[in-house]
């Protein structure tokens, strides 16, 4: 499908320079490839005290990780980094899950529970908007992304963000203090510590 589409379509639309470069390298297609970045809806600023009470979290006192529980998202690195923090009453909240339970997602959930991480499962609507409205920061430690919509959503809520320095995240154009070297748990912990101090 991908190969045929890239070779025979009159035009190809991509969502990031990373994917544009991939198509050029992999399929030698450089002409009539159009870059159109993803957008996100206007943020819905809200509170949901009952939901926060249910989760055991407080406004402004949690780091938010929001994505599918897949190995390439490196949420295990986020948990390891969180355990290194002098976090006080700041918690780590992981919003998301997996569509198909596998060894990685099961291990991640066990690791999270042992570290006292709050797992919300998949969330949307008012619950999701309240998590984005009130987070201390958003973190995305991924090793692979096309163009991370979750990062764009977090930025639309004016959250401080801490993200890996992979090409797709670099393409967003954040200041250098928002990035850490992908896979470096100590560097991730140092960035997070600065945000919560």
Spans of features found by a protein language model:
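Helix-loop-beta element that forms the nucleotide-linked donor phosphate-binding surface
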Residues: 8, 20-40
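Aromatic "clamp/platform" in nucleotide-sugar-dependent glycosyltransferases that forms part
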Residues: 141-143
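Conserved donor-binding/catalytic core segment of Leloir-type glycosyltransferases
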Residues: 56-83, 93
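Short hydrophobic beta-strand element within catalytic cores of glycosyltransferases
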Residues: 160-163
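Membrane-proximal helix-turn-helix segments that form the acceptor-binding/catalytic region
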Residues: 1-11
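Short alpha-helical donor nucleotide-sugar binding micro-motif in glycosyltransferases
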Residues: 122-123, 130-135
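Nucleotide-activated donor-binding/catalytic signature segment of Leloir-type glycosyltransferases, i.e.
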Residues: 105-126
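Conserved acidic donor-binding segment of nucleotide-sugar-dependent glycosyltransferases
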Residues: 178-185, 193-196
């Amino acid at each position: 499908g991908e190969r045929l589409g890239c070779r025979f379509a009159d035009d190809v639309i991509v969502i990031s320079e990373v994917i544009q470069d991939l198509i050029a390298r992999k399929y030698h297609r450089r002409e009539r490839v159009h870059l159109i970045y993803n957008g996100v809806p206007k943020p819905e600023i809200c509170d949901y005290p009952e939901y926060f009470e249910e989760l055991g979290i407080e406004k402004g006192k949690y780091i938010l990780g929001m994505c599918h529980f897949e190995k390439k998202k490196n949420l295990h690195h986020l948990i390891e980094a969180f355990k290194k923090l002098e976090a006080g009453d700041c918690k780590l909240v992981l919003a998301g899950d997996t569509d198909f339970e596998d060894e990685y997602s099961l291990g991640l959930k066990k690791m999270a529970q042992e570290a006292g991480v709050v797992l919300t499962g998949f969330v949307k609507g008012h619950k999701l908007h309240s998590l984005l409205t009130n987070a201390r920061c958003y973190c995305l430690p991924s090793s692979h992304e096309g163009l991370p919509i979750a990062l764009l959503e977090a930025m639309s809520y004016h959250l401080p963000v801490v993200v890996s320095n992979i090409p797709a995240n670099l393409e967003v154009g954040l200041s250098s203090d928002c990035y850490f070297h992908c896979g470096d748990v100590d560097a991730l912990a140092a960035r997070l510590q600065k945000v919560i101090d």
